[in-house]
Regions:
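Glycan-processing catalytic domains of CAZymes
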Residues: 1-153
Length: 153
């Protein structure tokens, strides 16, 4: 909580919480409670909170209606695309995996979250599909053709 306060005092305009997918790997009450405690502490700073990934945690918290008024949005990477980290290439997400994420994003939208997508290196056809899907659902998206997101383009 001290770090959240210090960051707020520095003038940040919101929090982007990464690695909430730890709950996917360790689906135990202690991890869930830890994430909820962290979110409640950060929320005290009255800044928007966006969670990156963490679909298993978010889905569980939605079932418990635990995030209303606390979390503003979610960012999901690689819904339509996927990354092969062994050779740093991009591909198309298998349809069954994509369907899972499309259902998840629909839950998030229905719950009231602002939804963000980040996709990597799609073909022109997949890029058109991503744009059409996001525009029809009111989602904010970015498409990167590089894994080096820290570099200006």
């Amino acid at each position: 909580k001290d770090k959240a306060r210090l960051l707020s005092q520095k003038g940040i305009d919101g929090f982007f919480l990464d690695n909430a997918d730890v709950y996917y790997h360790y689906q135990i009450p202690e991890i869930y409670r830890g994430l909820m405690t962290l979110l409640h502490e950060i929320h005290k700073e009255n800044k928007p909170i966006i969670i990156n990934g963490g679909d298993t945690f978010i889905s569980q918290a939605i079932k418990q209606n635990a995030l209303k008024g606390i979390v503003n949005g979610i960012n999901q990477e690689s819904v339509f695309t996927e990354i092969n980290f062994k050779d740093n290439t991009f591909g198309v997400k298998p349809i069954e995996d994509r369907e899972y994420f499309l259902d998840y994003l629909d839950q998030c939208k229905t719950y009231g979250f602002t939804v963000y997508l980040l996709e990597y290196g799609p073909s022109k056809k997949i890029e058109k599909d991503i744009k059409a899907y996001c525009q029809s659902n009111g989602f904010i998206y970015d498409i990167s053709h590089s894994l080096q997101l820290y570099k200006p383009f």
